[in-house]
Every structure is written in C-alpha cells, then in structure tokens.
C-alpha cells in the first residue's frame, strides 16, 4: 500500500510541476511578444522586469512538498473489529451479572434494588405534591381505584372548591 501511495504522490507531484512550468512559459512568451512589439529599444528594461517577474512567480508558487502533502489521501482504519469486540465483552458481562443475580437470595436482591435507587426518587416537586393532593381528594386514600372503570358518582365536595365564573366577564386564555 505504501508503494501505491508513494507512486500516486510522485505522479501528482510531476503533474503539478508540469502545470506550473507550463504556466510560467506561457506567461513569459506572451509577455515577451508584447514587450518586443511595443518596446523595441528597451531590451535592458525588459530583462530586469522579467527577472523581477520570475522572482514574484517563485514567491507565489507554494512549495511542491506542501502541495504533495495536500493531495495525500489516507485510508481510514476499519472500526468494525473494535465495535464487535466491545459488544461481545458487554454481552459476556451482562450474562455473568444475570447468573450471579439469580444465585442470590431474595433479601440480597432487595438490597441491590435499594442500593441502585436514584437519589432523586425521594425528592418531590411542587407539581407532584399538588397532583397527589388532588388524587387523595378525588379518590380517597383507602379506596382502590381501577383506572379501567370510571366512577362518575364521586363526592360533590370536590366540586364545591371550584371557582365560579361569571358569564358576563371575559377571560382570555
């Protein structure tokens, strides 16, 4: 592979070099024709301007090595092997954990569940407090509520707390 890459970079370098020299010769020949046509007597001035033009071209042309480095294409390493080994190791860890968990007695399992409880489980937001209070008012603490059956014969005491709205007043929601 390294031979292919070096051959490819050498080829691109030669192509770039020929393009650069071709552009320089074209600009020199066209400028020399124009200068000879317009200025027959100023040969010395032409040579000086050509030299300064060449110096300017050399400064504008980037180094050949920099251009070769820009055209180098590196092949990406395949990550499929890494992914498969990672997933198999996770699978092995999960199966070992499940086996150990099945061997443990129920008291130990309960301790594990309590240990892995989230610290935010015990925190109660104001919204959830209001919801719990409303549930207690609607359904009572001791009654078991079946969410599949709707009971429309609830207490009327809960309705008395509602705010009465006058029909004459306009409310914007």
UniProtKB/Swiss-Prot annotation:
Signal peptide: none annotated. GO terms for biological process: meiosis I; negative regulation of protein localization to nucleolus; positive regulation of exit from mitosis; sporulation resulting in formation of a cellular spore. The modification N-acetylserine is found at residue 2. GO terms for cellular component: nucleolus; nucleus. InterPro entries: Spo12. Residues 159-173 are annotated as: Negative-charged tail. The modification Phosphoserine is found at residues 118, 125. Residues 1-56 are annotated as: Disordered. Residues 1-12 have a biased composition (Polar residues). Keywords: Acetylation, Meiosis, Phosphoprotein, Sporulation. Its negative tail is functionally important. Present with 937 molecules/cell in log phase SD medium. It is required for meiosis I chromosome division during sporulation. A component of the FEAR (CDC14 early anaphase release) network which promotes CDC14 release from the nucleolus during early anaphase. This is Sporulation-specific protein 12. It comes from Saccharomyces cerevisiae (strain ATCC 204508 / S288c) (Baker's yeast). The lineage of its organism: Eukaryota, Fungi, Dikarya, Ascomycota, Saccharomycotina.
